[in-house]
């Protein structure tokens, strides 16, 4: 899905298929379609918007608003391991191991593809 028009981003990702390049005026609508229409999610290193979208989907899975198997590949191990210390979240009791079952952190395109295709079978 196309990013929201932001003043500091001048163009869409050139790798998005034209048929999948949508414009959204409102963030909430983009996130709804993002969660509703996607079968899997690949998250690349990013800023607050990327984190917002990731945590939105994780919250929907945790609260069972998304009940289907929804694999999430988090690409870029160093970036995400520095950013998210899930062990601390587990220690505080705010997430469980089950909450992390949908996450797959990797640097390998091959492993990411394998993970998604196995989960969606």
Predicted ranges, named:
Residues 1-4:
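Conserved small/polar residues in nucleotide/adenosyl-binding loops
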Residues 6-11, 50, 79-82:
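Short gly/pro/ser/thr-enriched loop/turn and capping motifs at secondary-structure boundaries
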Residues 6-36:
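Glycine-rich oxoanion-binding loops at beta->alpha junctions
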Residues 28-33, 37-43, 61, 68, ...:
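C-terminal binding/interaction regions
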Residues 49-56:
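Short glycine/serine/threonine-rich phosphate/pyrophosphate-binding segments
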Residues 56-62:
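Histidine-anchored nucleotide/phosphate-binding helix
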Residues 74-121:
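C-terminal functional extensions of proteins
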